Amino acid sequence: MMPAMRASLILGCLLIIGPWAILAENPLPTIFPDKDELVQALHSSFTLKCTGESEVSWQNPNSNPEKQNVVIRSEENNSGLFVSILEVSDASAFDTGLYTCYHNHTQTEESEIEGTDIYIYVPDPNVPFAPPGLFDHIIVVEEDESALVPCRTTDPSSEVTLKNIESSRTVFAFYDSKQGFAGNFPPGSYICETTSNKMVYQTEPYILQTWKATHNISVEMEAPKTMFRAGETIAIDCIVLDNEVVDLKWTYPGKQRGVGIRNVEESKVPYQRLVYTLTLANATTEDSGEYECAVIHATLDNRVVKKTNITVHEKGFIDLEPMFGSEEFANLHEVKSFIVNLHAYPTPGLFWLKDNRTLSENLTEITTSIVTTKETRFQSKLKLIRAKEEDSGLYTLVAQNDRETKSYSFILQIKVPALILELVDKHHGASGEQTVGCLAKGMPVPDVEWLVCKDIKRCNNDTLWSILATNGSEISMETHQDDEQIESQVTFKKIEETMAIRCIAKNELGVVARELKLVAPTLRSELTVAAAVLVLLVIVIISLIVLVIIWKQKPRYEIRWRVIESISPDGHEYIYVDPMQLPYDSRWEFPRDGLVLGRILGSGAFGKVVEGAAYGLSRSQPVMKVAVKMLKPTARSSEKQALMSELKIMTHLGAHLNIVNLLGACTKSGPIYIITEYCFYGDLVNYLHKNRDNFQSRHPEKPKKDLDIFGLNPADESTRSYVILSFENNGDYMDMKQADTMQYVPMLEMKEPSKYSDIQRSLYDRPASYKKKPLSEVKNILSDDGFEGLTVLDLLSFTYQVARGMEFLASKNCVHRDLAARNVLLAHGKIVKICDFGLARDIMHDSNYVSKGSTFLPVKWMAPESIFDNLYTTLSDVWSFGILLWEIFSLGGTPYPGMIVDSTFYNKIKSGYRMAKPDHATHEVYDIMVKCWNSEPEKRPSFRHLSDIVESLLPMEYKRCYETVLHDFLKSDHPAVTRMRSDSDNSYIGVTYKNEHKMKDRESGFDEQRLSADSGYIIPLPDIDPVSEDESGKRNRHSSQTSEESAIETGSSSSTFIKRDDETIEDIDMMDDIGIDSSDLVEDSFL
């Protein structure tokens, strides 16, 4: 046959046989009777027979669990077919439905049944509708799609009506008794209705819902891990977004073995999300392979498949893949990286070693990093930022997990140019032999060679250098080398003339050379002597410089008091009087032989204060107990000038009840002595500490722990010393050292109270109520007779007297600059006296003073403008007065308790921090402190205003008592008063200001008016008006002199009583023993 004809014949056969061959391969079973539907009578029986080429099964509609009337059995057929018989007895409405026979091998778990169908009706007049399925009453369809209401009837001839419950209207639609009503129905509730035996029957409501279906399917597969070890759990998520009308099928290696748990979770926030999870616990290597999830749209022919590969290892592993060799090189200062790739599971821990020691993570020029490139792929990088010579060494990367540890090591060599470490001349003494050593290093190790130049003056010409020739007798050479260095030595048996020798070291990175001059032995000794002299000279110069620096940094004594001469127009610059330009009146001079010194009351870095007895200082008091200020014998000239300045300022100021008054001075034929009043009770801080246990306050139950503000332990009170000005050195107050008992000269004490304070002590022991008190409560306030306790009235009295004393200093344009309780003394009668005790205080070791350059400053007492701008005025003294007021009402507490003077302290002062009210202060007293601590100096009250405020808190009787004591003082023959009175008859008493608004002018500006009471030195003062005699009687404050009518004529000190040469202080003490009243001979202070 022709080939073309044969091909056509074969193709035709295929076309004819092909479809039958396909049908023959998958034929459907056969049901007998061979009909589409049958109607069976109620309670009858029927049989269905199914025949197939393989095993067959039935799907029947019987949904009544209580009636087991269906029997299925198999029969054998001689033709080799498989036969299944379905027998139904006592048929009922529950048996109405579709019966399907199918081959078993054609069905899967998730596929629809494909077989041969027959529909059976069993009419029941009482049950016109076939029983519905479990979920048939909920109908969900896509928008604009046809819906099926499955109200099937048991009788095919029944007429059925569909009604909408909400509208109660009949819905016209196509009806099939095997399926129900089909059509496009709006959402709502529907019922089916039919009539049987003249009765109307209705179904349960059918709920119809529609949704807008998404045609697109968005699927994501998430597998946190794709690599596992045997025994771990595999978890894979298949996520469907924005579509819930889908079906999902898993395909994976373990599905045939029935392993795996499949779950689904749905969330609608923030968007529609279906998460299908496949979980396989205790994975094995058989679970390795491809995992697939197929998502199929429920109503559309859409399908999306996602796949991933899972690998399960029997155990963990680590594989290292270095990108470099076992020995590497890097140039000096080169940036170089070394990378190692890793394939490992589980994730390993990685670290680098250098010379078997862990590389520190804080290195700045060697960094390590780890990057994960894939799930089981990693990359570790060692990077040299600027390679250094010391970076050479053995580097090791160690990788380890819970099952395995692996490492990779390599040697790194840093190439370094040749470098000569030292070139030395080793002289061998008298033999004349000299050895020159050259030590060099580099990587690679350099080679060394020697050159010599014998014409020493022309060695800068390289052509005169020649290679050093060695011979065994005169010149020899030795070389020693290790892995890093090389040392070459040249030995000369004898050098007869000076020459230069050059060492050259070279390797592949560079060449370096150093030269050395070799000197003949005869010249060496001369050079040695010259060098020794030069070194000695340098040492001497350095020592002198150090001594000068130490001398300049040593603190110098300076008087704190300053007298203002003028002020700049803007008020920010003050010009102070140079005390050395003030005159010194010789009338203050007192003969040295009239002064007997006793024990030391206090000593400091610059001087001391000594108790003394002055003979002939006063006409009415032949012997007076005094305090004598003097410098130490080692004092410098600048400190002598400072003490002389203090003397001149005191003579300029004049006398006042509330300052420590000058009594005399010894300035000739010996050291300078300043003689001042002696105050029996010492400084105010000491007095407050001593009497704080006897303080009568509104809070007598206050516990002892409140003493912590003083930095003291109450249990130690019995051991604390309170003798005049002698204190224990606790660092809080003056470093007053106890005097040597061998130096002590006994002083006479008064036998009766002073005639200027002969007023009994008040019984007033309660806080001032600031109302007028009866005379019986305030009588004899200024006396210290009898009871040793303290009251709030005493504290107000101290405050008032300090304010009066500072008012007097302010009227003299005097700025104190160190106003504090330690610089306030207490005399008999509780008379307060302001002083400057800096000379006798060890301020270098006093915590109240802070070093600033060559001086020490009491920072905690200073105003902000003094601390930060070095500006001292009367208004800055007002700030210090507020601090002193806090000290008084805290009974001697240290200001800013618990705070040290540092940057934090300064910042707090700048930001407006102020101390809280002390325990014993009333709100009125604390208000005074706050006014004194105003950050703007011009808004602080003046001392005159402060005196008025405190005076208003005191009883009127106290004011009268104080004015009486002041008046008696100014009329007395006190040496300070008489010397000033003899200078001028113009009284200080009664000087006042024209207007109240000029109070600020007293601190901030002065005119050209001058007082004649200033010892002849002219100081500018504000405008003042003299007052009348009546006004003078009402306010007698400021006088440092009395009027001519009350003046007591006195002579100079040279005409007063002089101590006999053979008389001692001990002789005076004996006067009491023989009945002589010494009270007229000794005046304790001026009282």
From Swiss-Prot:
- Which parts of the sequence carry Phosphotyrosine? 574, 576, 722, 733, 744, 756, 764, 849, 988, 1017
PTM field = Ubiquitinated, leading to its internalization and degradation.
Tell me which SUPFAM superfamilies the record gives: Immunoglobulin, Protein kinase-like (PK-like)
Where it sits in the cell: the answer is: Cell membrane; Cell projection, Cilium; Golgi apparatus
Q: Which domain of life is it from?
A: Eukaryota
Enumerate the residues binding ATP. Answer: 601-609, 629
The signal peptide stretch is 1-24
| Alphabetic keyword roster | ATP-binding, Cell membrane, Cell projection, Chemotaxis, Developmental protein, Disulfide bond, Glycoprotein, Golgi apparatus, Immunoglobulin domain, Kinase, Membrane, Nucleotide-binding, Phosphoprotein, Receptor, Repeat, Signal, Transferase, Transmembrane, Transmembrane helix, Tyrosine-protein kinase, Ubl conjugation
Q: What is its main location?
A: membrane
Per the UniProt entry, the glycosylated residues are: 77, 104, 216, 282, 309, 356, 362, 461, 471
Concerning InterPro entries, the annotation shows:
Ig-like_dom (IPR007110), Ig-like_dom_sf (IPR036179), Ig-like_fold (IPR013783), Ig_I-set (IPR013098), Ig_sub (IPR003599), Ig_sub2 (IPR003598), Kinase-like_dom_sf (IPR011009), PDGFRA (IPR027290)
Record-level GO cellular component terms: cilium; Golgi apparatus; plasma membrane; receptor complex
Q: Which residues act catalytically here?
A: 818 (proton acceptor)
The Ig-like C2-type domain, residue ranges: 27-114, 118-211, 217-309, 315-409, 417-519
Q: Which GO terms describe its biological process?
A: cell migration; cell surface receptor protein tyrosine kinase signaling pathway; chemotaxis; embryonic cranial skeleton morphogenesis; positive regulation of cell population proliferation
Q: Which CDD domains match?
A: Ig4_PDGFR, IgI_PDGFR-alphabeta, PTKc_PDGFR_alpha
From the record, give the cysteines joined by S-S bonds.
50-101, 151-192, 238-293, 438-503
Q: Which reaction does it catalyse?
A: L-tyrosyl-[protein] + ATP = O-phospho-L-tyrosyl-[protein] + ADP + H(+)
Region annotation (Disordered) maps to: 1017-1064
Task: Describe how its activity is regulated.
Answer: Present in an inactive conformation in the absence of bound ligand. Binding of pdgfa and/or pdgfb leads to dimerization and activation by autophosphorylation on tyrosine residues.
**Residues annotated as domain Protein kinase:** 595-970
What residue ranges lie in the Cytoplasmic compartment?
552-1087
Q: Can you state the subunit structure given in the record?
A: Interacts with homodimeric pdgfa, pdgfb and pdgfc, and with heterodimers formed by pdgfa and pdgfb. Monomer in the absence of bound ligand. Interaction with dimeric pdgfa, pdgfb and/or pdgfc leads to receptor dimerization, where both pdgfra homodimers and heterodimers with pdgfrb are observed.
Question: Which family is this protein grouped under?
Answer: Belongs to the protein kinase superfamily. Tyr protein kinase family. CSF-1/PDGF receptor subfamily.
Q: What does this protein do?
A: Tyrosine-protein kinase that acts as a cell-surface receptor for pdgfa, pdgfb and pdgfc and plays an essential role in the regulation of embryonic development, cell proliferation, survival and chemotaxis. Depending on the context, promotes or inhibits cell proliferation and cell migration. Plays an important role in the differentiation of bone marrow-derived mesenchymal stem cells. Required for normal skeleton development. Required for normal development of the gastrointestinal tract. Plays a role in cell migration and chemotaxis in wound healing.
* Descriptive protein name: Platelet-derived growth factor receptor alpha
